[in-house]
Amino acid sequence: MARKPAKRWARDYVFDILKELGIHYIFGVPGTNEIPIIDGTSYPENGVRYVECLHENIAIGAAMGSARMTGKPAVILVHVTPGIAHTIGNLFNAWRSSMPLVILCAQQQNELVTQEPLLASNLVDLAQQYTKWAHEVRTEQELPMVLQRAFKEAMAPPAGPVFVAIPWEFTMREIGPDDRVKGVTQISPHFTGDPGTIRQAAALLSKAKNPLIIAGDAVGYANAWPELQDLAEILGAPVLLQTFSSVANFPNDDYHWQGELPGTQSGMQAIFEDHDVAFLVGWGCQAQVTVFKYTGGPLIPPDVTQIYLSNSTWDIGKNYYGEAAIFGDIKATLPLLNDLVRKNPPKGASSRNKTMRSGDAARAKNWTDYLAKAMKAKDIWAVVIAHALRGCIDELKLAKKFVYVHEAVSDPAPFQYYLPFTNESAAPISYYCVAGGSLGWSMPASLGIKLEDQGWQDIETRLVVNAVGDGSSLFYPQVWWTAAHRELGILYIITNNHEYHTLQLGLQQVVAAYGSAPGYEWNPKTLWPDYLTIHRPKVDFLTVAKGLGGIEGEKVHTPAEVKAAVRKGVDYVLKNKRSYLLDMRIAPDTPPAPSTTVPDEVLERYISQPPLDFVHTITQNNVLALAEEGKSPNIPIIF
């Protein structure tokens, strides 16, 4: 007797798609409306696990980490209005960082929504500002069509988040055994730009007297390091990265690499002003500054010839006119451009390359000297942590087997310089950050990264390290419960200075930029206010982690203790399916209140820190002078 086919429900359309695309997780916080879909993860034949998180912004952050590793859409399941509302911080990050996500939101019963029932609202309006497409399913019959479109659109270049609200009773309706989603349309991202426009861009680059390259996130997502390195060599051009790059957009052992753009108006202007031609490649977030005055002039001086290459029409000429605008995939298009420029390279390229090689050697010595100074300091400087991590990666032969998740926002430069983001040891996705700047992204992301064994750019996630400031870590410490529950071995490093130090630097910038300007004579009572500190009481992170997930760890107080502590933490997470926490006591920067002076510790720690960018070196003598000029090398500002 023939076996009767198992019953299928409308929720199974979701699992049809996940099986086809090889997606193995759904992230979320359980709610009654979501149970029909969550129940589908209980069936082994669906091949999907439900990852329980304790807050929706953790769920979407974890999904972002998963999507970054696989290159496929990650799926989040949220609960009516509060569910999507709780995701907004990281949804904004996902939108700015071009993350392929599909957010499924279980709406209240369709026949009831108009009557404004408990928790219901216009969900599409909540989500659509930060999604490529947002839609609420109108009938159960359109569910397979809508789901196919959602996953197609999330993957289509440039990738991004998509939102679908589904009245929850639709998911429980029985469907026929042969009612399935036929497939998901996949649009290839590998398309080349228009040949005529490529020739136009090549001609402009060949005539450049002092070219500059700005590399945005689309470079890293395209896995286009070698192609951009080739162009930098041909042009003799320094390469700066998008401020708050989501990935490593250029290898840091290439002498053309100059770190990220400054996060200030005059700082950006100083980068561009000495160059006649700027090649802006995959650069989406073009105004990552927080203080701007039109009287100070545009971020890119008007006499700079701008050439664009991007897979997003929105990002081409978004803020300023481009003399040449190539719409195409970066990895597919750059070789065509490179071949043309190679036939007619700009004058002086060889000389500029020689100068940059010398500058790279000098930069290495400066960082070695800075590390030696840091080892003699009373408290821990971030460079000591970064150097210790690099040592572990090298000694344990973890090349292409590590992912560094960065949210130590007061101290990006040491990690960006010392960790081996090189062709031999890493790939663009070996570095994880976000372009949006909404804090609290990294700890959730570490979950999704560690869940995926392999990254699509031929890397592994054997070692996942998350460096995060103490302020940022307090957004979602519930992460530690999920890490323990799912047995994820992640090394968490809290750079703990008991304050919102980045905001203190931001306050200095505001005062310097506006404090004496007509109509803006406001000045704070102190530059070091108590409300920007985290003390009285100081948070005991080890106790919090222990209580939420039984996570072990230790406090580290001096530079001499860092190397052994980092090695212990790395060994622990590699050998155990459990996370480990290092509470690193970073030098406290706040003097006794009230004060309007800058403490010596800040001067020593930051002003002696070598700039990553040696081509456009900025050398002021103190932090307030840096703020006055709007040029704080290596220190981005977030409000």
Question: In which residue ranges do the predicted regions lie?
Answer:
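A glycine-rich phosphate-binding loop feature that marks nucleotide/adenosyl-phosphate handling sites
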Residues: 165-170, 409-411, 585-586
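Basic phosphate/pyrophosphate-binding loop/patch that engages nucleotide-derived ligands
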Residues: 156, 397-399, 484-490
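Thiamine diphosphate
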Residues: 104, 113-119, 263, 272-274, ...
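Phosphate/pyrophosphate-binding active-site segments
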Residues: 1-6, 141, 177-179, 302-408, ...
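Conserved short loop/turn motifs at secondary-structure junctions
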Residues: 216-221, 374-377, 469-471
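Generic recognition of flexible, low-complexity loop/linker segments
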Residues: 14, 151, 199-202, 227-228, ...
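N-terminal alpha/beta PP-like core and its mobile active-site loop of ThDP/TPP-dependent enzymes
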Residues: 2-345, 392, 456, 461, ...
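Active-site diphosphate/adenylate-binding microenvironment
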Residues: 11-14, 19-24, 29-32, 37-42, ...
